[in-house]
């Protein structure tokens, strides 16, 4: 009675829940489910965290070349058949002995075919050999083209005179004459100052050298095509060459 009186005095009547066990069970299930969700979220975050950066040992040349044999084909124009035949041993020797590649001239397709083999140790050997043969086919001397195998920072660049200025007829012939000069003097001067090698084949110009030197030679040739006098071009390239020499 006292408890009832206190309950009535407070304004509340005590109520005993019959489903106490069910409520406890329900609360336990909810808490366990919430715990599992928390664990799952924690696992997701742990999986989402980037692991330590993997460190792999560098592969050797033999492991890199364990795939199929790679082949490069370089087409040879008709005007280069005779020079290729005369200089075949000079081309064959460095490619086979130094680079460890196989090379042959396919008489049916008129292509020089180069491929890797078991003796190939360097991955870049095939690209170097292809550039070497391509340079010779474009008209460079074997000794000059051989630098593509020995040095890594040499490149080939080709463009046409008509790409610089759309010339035709006698105007085109005069532009070619300005690039070559009397007895090849202008071409040799540009080669010596810029330390490049230049091949002038009709309307096509091929330049062999480093990136910066090719840029200087190309600028000089473009100025000659556009009509600048050779003396002015000489002065410009000498000034640029001296500045680049001081810089390095």
UniProtKB/Swiss-Prot annotation:
Record SUPFAM superfamilies: Eukaryotic type KH-domain (KH-domain type I)
- Gene3D superfamilies this protein is in? K Homology domain, type 1 (3.30.1370.10)
What GO biological process term is on the record, naming one?
ribosomal small subunit biogenesis
User: Which ranges are annotated Basic and acidic residues under compositional bias?
Assistant: 39-50
Where in this protein does the record put region Disordered? 1-63
Residue ranges constituting the KH domain according to the UniProt record: 169-221
Record's keyword terms, sorted: Nucleus, RNA-binding
Please tell me whether the keyword RNA-binding is annotated for this protein. Answer: yes
Q: Give one Pfam hit by family name.
A: KH_PNO1_2nd
Cellular component terms (Gene Ontology): nucleolus; nucleus; small-subunit processome
Locations listed in the record: Nucleus, Nucleolus
SMART domains with a match to the protein in the record: KH (SM00322)
The protein's matches in InterPro entries, at most eight in alphabetical order, are given as: KH-I_PNO1_first, KH_dom, KH_dom_type_1_sf, KH_PNO1_2nd
MF terms (GO), sorted A to Z: RNA binding
Q: Can you state the subunit structure given in the record?
A: Part of the small subunit (SSU) processome, composed of more than 70 proteins and the RNA chaperone small nucleolar RNA (snoRNA) U3.
Q: Family per UniProt?
A: Belongs to the PNO1 family.
Its biological purpose is as follows: Part of the small subunit (SSU) processome, first precursor of the small eukaryotic ribosomal subunit. During the assembly of the SSU processome in the nucleolus, many ribosome biogenesis factors, an RNA chaperone and ribosomal proteins associate with the nascent pre-rRNA and work in concert to generate RNA folding, modifications, rearrangements and cleavage as well as targeted degradation of pre-ribosomal RNA by the RNA exosome. Positively regulates dimethylation of two adjacent adenosines in the loop of a conserved hairpin near the 3'-end of 18S rRNA.
The record's listing under PANTHER family reads: RIBONUCLEASE Y (PTHR12826), RNA-BINDING PROTEIN PNO1 (PTHR12826:SF13)
Instruction: Quote the protein name from its UniProt record.
Output: RNA-binding protein PNO1
Q: What species does this protein belong to?
A: Rattus norvegicus
């Amino acid at each position: 009675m006292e408890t009832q009186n206190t309950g009535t005095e407070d304004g509340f009547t005590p109520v005993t829940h019959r489903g106490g066990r069910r409520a406890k069970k329900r609360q336990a299930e909810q808490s366990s489910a919430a715990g599992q969700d928390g664990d799952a979220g924690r696992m997701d975050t742990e999986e989402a965290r980037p692991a330590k950066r993997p460190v792999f040992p560098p592969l050797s040349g033999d492991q890199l070349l364990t795939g199929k044999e790679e082949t490069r084909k370089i087409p040879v124009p008709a005007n280069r058949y005779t020079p290729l035949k005369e200089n075949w041993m000079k081309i064959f020797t460095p490619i086979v002995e130094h680079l460890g590649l196989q090379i042959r001239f396919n008489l049916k397709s008129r292509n020089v075919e180069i491929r890797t083999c078991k003796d190939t140790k360097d991955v870049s050997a095939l690209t170097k050999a292809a550039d070497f043969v391509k340079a010779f086919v474009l008209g460079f001397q074997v000794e000059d083209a051989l630098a593509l195998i020995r040095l890594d920072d040499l490149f080939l660049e080709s463009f046409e005179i008509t790409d610089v200025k759309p010339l035709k007829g006698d105007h085109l012939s005069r532009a070619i004459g300005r690039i070559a000069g009397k007895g090849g003097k202008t071409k040799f001067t540009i080669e010596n100052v810029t330390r490049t090698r230049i091949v002038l084949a009709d309307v096509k110009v091929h330049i062999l050298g480093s990136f910066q030197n090719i840029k200087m030679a190309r600028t000089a040739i473009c100025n000659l095509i556009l009509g600048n006098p050779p003396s002015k071009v000489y002065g410009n390239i000498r000034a640029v060459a001296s500045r680049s020499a001081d810089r390095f």
